[in-house]
Swiss-Prot record:
E.C. code: 1.16.1.9
Function as written in the Swiss-Prot or TrEMBL entry: Cell surface metalloreductase. May be involved in copper homeostasis.
GO biological process: copper ion import; intracellular iron ion homeostasis; iron ion transport
Induction note: By transcription factor MAC1 upon copper deprivation.
Positions with a binding annotation for heme 1: H197, H271
Stretches in topological domain Extracellular: 1-45, 129-167, 216-237, 287-292
Entry's family note: Belongs to the ferric reductase (FRE) family.
Gene Ontology cellular-component terms listed: plasma membrane
Name of encoding gene: FRE7
Membrane topology of this protein: Multi-pass membrane protein
InterPro entries recorded: FAD-bd_8, FAD-bd_FR_type, Fe3_Rdtase_TM_dom, Fe_red_NAD-bd_6, Ferric/Cupric_Reductase, FNR_nucleotide-bd, Riboflavin_synthase-like_b-brl
Residue ranges of domain Ferric oxidoreductase in the record: 161-320
GO molecular function annotations of the record: ferric-chelate reductase (NADPH) activity; metal ion binding
Protein name as catalogued: Ferric/cupric reductase transmembrane component 7
Amino acid sequence: MIEERDLVLSNGIHCIADIHSELYARLKKESQAVTPWVYQKQYGKFVTYFVAVIIFLSLIKKLAFMYYDSSEEFLPEKKNSPTTPSVFLARIMTKLVAFNRYICYRKFPTLIFSYLGIPTSVGTFLVVMATTLYTLLYCFVPHPFYRPCAGFGSPPLSVRAGIMAISLVSFVFSLSGKINVIGWLVGLSYEKINIYHQWASILCLFFSWVHVIPFLRQARHEGGYERMHQRWKASDMWRSGVPPILFLNLLWLSSLPIARRHFYEIFLQLHWILAVGFYISLFYHVYPELNSHMYLVATIVVWFAQLFYRLAVKGYLRPGRSFMASTIANVSIVGEGCVELIVKDVDMAYSPGQHIFVRTIDKDIISNHPFSIFPSAKYPGGIKMLIRAQKGFSKRLYESNDDMKKILIDGPYGGIERDIRSFTNVYLICSGSGISTCLPFLQKYGPILHKTNLEVITLDWVVRHREDISWIRDEICTLSNNLRQLFLDGTIVVRIYVCSDSTVPGIIKTFPQTADTASDQSDLAKREKDTEFGQDDTESNSTFDKSNNEYKGLITIIPSKPDLNQVINDYQIGFRNCFICSGSDSLRYTVGNSVAGLQAKVFSNKNVEECYLHSESFGY
């Protein structure tokens, strides 16, 4: 029986048998006086204050760069502007920023860290670890963890862990939206702060279990398993907290990298259903204890505000448009494993590096997939998307025989916060379909290059096969024609690295070529010069020769896999440099570490003021 396992305190009081005695009541008051139950709600505020400080510092950084970029003389009206920062303050700022980037731009081994769900960026990792350490210290340093008897009140460790978990729920939901106020304040798009959403969820789960375990342990310590069973039967299951922690564990399991990788579409649909169940059950569990439900009230207000803003500005409820108005996209296969989607006329303003979510109106209508967009050269005013066939939606799209698809567009999202016009040198580094992110920067800023601070734009694109270049053949031809002199002057440099040389004659007839090296591929020196594609028939050769004379020296095609670290170190670094990369994990790993190393030039060379990196990927 329970009485046989009744904890006796040093003063002789029994935690179970004496629960109604006057001495028990007096000891309970003393315990509450030493560690007030009501004070534990302050720990939720401590977590909120810490996150608010991080957001505030990030906001200051964003505003500082906005002011710094706007003070640059990249427009005639900015010449000799009195708002230009003082030289002394500018030097201090650039050195501090370079030191920060020297550390934060570095990358951990992608394969290991991504598999474990750990941030690969050193900067992101440090923020996550600082938040984790802060919350752990605030939870476990204060004592006592337990009260002498459970009847004296809930274990202090449980209460403060629970209130800390609830305070984190607000940030978990706020960080989950494609449009979110935190991302707007700190100047980061949702896909970049999604890692903070994931880790806030992990911390919330951890503190939820810290909240649960002391209750179970103290009940067992005082009266054994029978006491635990008795307290379980006496509580309302829906009120007990079991449903919310069950939902939270299911959310965590379904969000593991391995689950997202293999069951991404199931994860997307399951995620929001579990989140709704978690929120409702948690509200029922905590109301009205310590006013903690107010965190959840604030959460739902912010979340719905973000959702309605997204639907009205980016989504299907835009003013002046029909509800969920669809559009037609042309579908075509442009190479092995690659699909091209072109929307001829788009009523949407977008910037280089942004992406949209595409939903096809067919059996895949529940699926919503992100794709980078860039202007179509074939259809002025239209947008183009390159989609690599992998699994799920992209594979079905590639294998379909449809020439057109009716789609819903949600977006645009993402992009770069900095003003590209304030830099002197822009380096675009990409692999595969990552060209979708980098090419629009060249398309937009190439024609206005001399109206800005920009001096050089360099594009380095790594592809597997030579025929992959046909993905953007129209766009490259248009740029070569319109900006021919800039190409010849070396103001615009385009290099394409072909890792596996597999010429397809039919693809290259109209592609602008640069030098006659196809006849002597064994000459190593020729590989570093402009390379052309060969033709087998006389008519094609004649066409090619004319094209070659017109575009000679414009595009460099190198039939070898590049050492990107060496490529970046060989750049002629300018005064203010912007690196934009998009592509594989290995590419972003190399570029991140290389640009981190370039920060040393800011200290050693007075002619180098900034090396800024913007990397793009859909890693969520």
